[in-house]
Curated annotation (Swiss-Prot):
PANTHER family linked: TRANSMEMBRANE PROTEIN 135, TRANSMEMBRANE PROTEIN 135-RELATED
Gene: Tmem135
Organism: Mus musculus (Mouse)
Location in the cell: Mitochondrion membrane; Peroxisome membrane
Family membership: Belongs to the TMEM135 family.
GO terms under biological process: alpha-linolenic acid metabolic process; determination of adult lifespan; fatty acid derivative biosynthetic process; fatty acid derivative transport; long-chain fatty acid biosynthetic process; long-chain fatty acid transport; mitochondrion organization; peroxisome organization
Record GO cellular component, one term: peroxisome
Bilayer topology annotation: Multi-pass membrane protein
UniProt name for this protein: Transmembrane protein 135
Cell membrane found in the keyword field: no
């Protein structure tokens, strides 16, 4: 870590807004670029979300535009206020210290910006930025040799997280809202202890299906025969009395779970690749084949499918071994199911789910009266996390997640890469390492230190 007392005499033009010597002009340029990009991000995002949630006409008329503008204002303020505090700190302190170009300027900017955003979105933004900041700090520690990497560490973290999530899922009132609904969709409602699916209702549903198929024409008889054959195979097999999958034996229950979630994962990855595939439809038509026969499609499918099948298989196995259904089974089953991430390794997914788990446990502690409640916790955590990420973007971009760095470049129209990081190398973080010794051309009339590449006025 660079010494906090070390400083350089350069002004804000020489280090920050090297494209223009005026702080006001630079502020306006950053603000306009950030606003333009923010509207491009949030307008389609909110519109798609409104369509998927089947919002009524009143929402589109009175709420959609204000919400888009509010979120766009938040993101714009985050970028514009950063350059503002960057210049203010330099004028107040008279020089740059190791912490001022990044963390010092970003902390107050992020705090003010998050107050503009709607309260309902602050929690999600906080989780995302806390996750990103944790990953950034980890990379910084590895780069400095203070932290040693663990092979398949993201898989181990996911195993622990999955074990805890599945335990809460099995417990009464353990999870609520979207998290509970998502896990119920993934592993099925048969794994919920309070599930009211009785053998009688299962039998009644099967009888209804049979009645329905009786009136089908002859053309459908082959399909009906295949269905009947599959149903008979699924039903006639080992199933423990504690298992609630009444229409399947334990083996077919696991196989069906794998096939279902494999299909979901495969289709999700295909949908994510559709925009890039159609962009090259006329120039490279062969890319359409890669939409369906891509390695990542099968990897995500294998990850989700094996997670469900391992979880269900382990749960059934433990019910057979212990002759009872227990919430503690979910810890073992969830941990073993987490090994499925070997098919689709992702530090981002592991860190995000772990962050959400910490948030869930924190609020459970508040409900139990064992953990104090901090009213401004989300605002403070967001501010500190964003400041850490901005500091990395300025002082050591090699330790920042590449996708977030690209986002910052989009938000500032590429101006974030124009900082004079060569002058920041004195702090020992390798600030210019990824910029191929880039040195900005500066007007010597507005500099404190003689520039290496002065603008030639001749």
């Amino acid at each position: 870590m660079a010494a906090l007392s070390k400083s350089i005499p350069h002004n804000c033009y020489e280090i920050g807004h090297t494209w223009h010597p005026s702080c006001r002009v630079s502020f306006l340029q950053i603000t306009w670029g950030a606003l333009e990009e923010s509207l491009r991000i949030y307008a389609p995002l909110y519109l798609i979300a409104a369509v998927l949630r089947k919002r009524k006409l009143e929402y589109y008329l009175y709420k959609l535009l204000p919400e888009i503008l509010q979120s766009a204002s938040f993101l714009t303020a985050n970028g514009a206020l950063y350059i503002t505090f960057f210049c203010i700190l330099r004028k107040i302190l008279g020089k740059f210290y190791s912490w001022t170009p990044g963390f010092g300027a970003a902390l107050p900017a992020s705090y003010v910006a998050i107050l503009i955003e709607r309260k309902s979105r602050r929690g999600l933004l906080t989780i995302y930025m806390a996750n990103l900041a944790t990953e950034t700090l980890f990379r910084m520690g590895v780069a400095r040799g203070t932290i040693t990497t663990l092979r398949n560490g993201e898989v181990l973290l996911f195993c622990i997280t999955a074990a805890m999530y599945m335990f809460f899922f099995r417990c009464k009132d353990g999870l609520k809202g979207f998290t509970f609904s998502a896990l119920r969709f993934i592993v099925g409602k048969e794994e919920i202890p309070t599930h009211s699916y009785s053998p009688e209702t299962a039998y009644a549903k099967v009888e209804q299906k049979r009645e329905k198929h009786k009136g089908t024409p002859r053309a459908m008889s082959i399909i009906a025969l295949v269905r009947t054959l599959v149903d008979s195979v699924c039903k006639h097999g080992p199933r423990h009395r504690c298992c609630k999958h009444y229409e399947d034996n334990c083996i077919s229950y696991c196989i069906k779970g794998f096939i279902r979630m494999f299909s979901v994962g495969y289709l999700i990855q295909c949908c994510l690749r559709i925009p890039s595939a159609f962009r090259h439809l006329f120039t490279e038509p062969s890319r359409l084949l890669s939409l369906f026969y891509n390695k990542e499609n099968f990897q995500l499918g294998a990850f989700l499918g094996s997670f469900v099948s391992i979880y269900k298989g382990t749960s059934c196995f433990l019910r057979w071994i212990r002759n009872l259904d227990d919430e503690l089974h979910a810890i073992v089953a969830g941990f073993l199911a987490g090994v499925s991430m070997m098919f689709y390794k992702s530090t981002t997914i592991s860190m995000y789910l772990a962050s959400k788990l910490v948030e869930t446990m924190y609020f459970k502690g508040i409900e139990a009266g064992k953990v104090p409640y901090f009213p401004q916790a989300d605002t403070i955590i967001y501010s500190i996390s964003t400041a850490i990420c901005f500091h990395a973007a300025v002082m050591e971009v090699q330790n920042l997640r590449p996708s977030y760095w690209k986002f910052l470049l989009r938000l500032t129209k590429g101006r974030f890469a124009l900082m004079n990081r060569k002058a920041l190398d004195v702090f020992g973080t390798g600030a210019s390492r990824e910029f191929h010794n880039f040195i900005p051309r500066l007007d010597p009339r507005y500099t404190v230190v003689t520039p290496e590449l002065p603008i030639d006025f001749s």
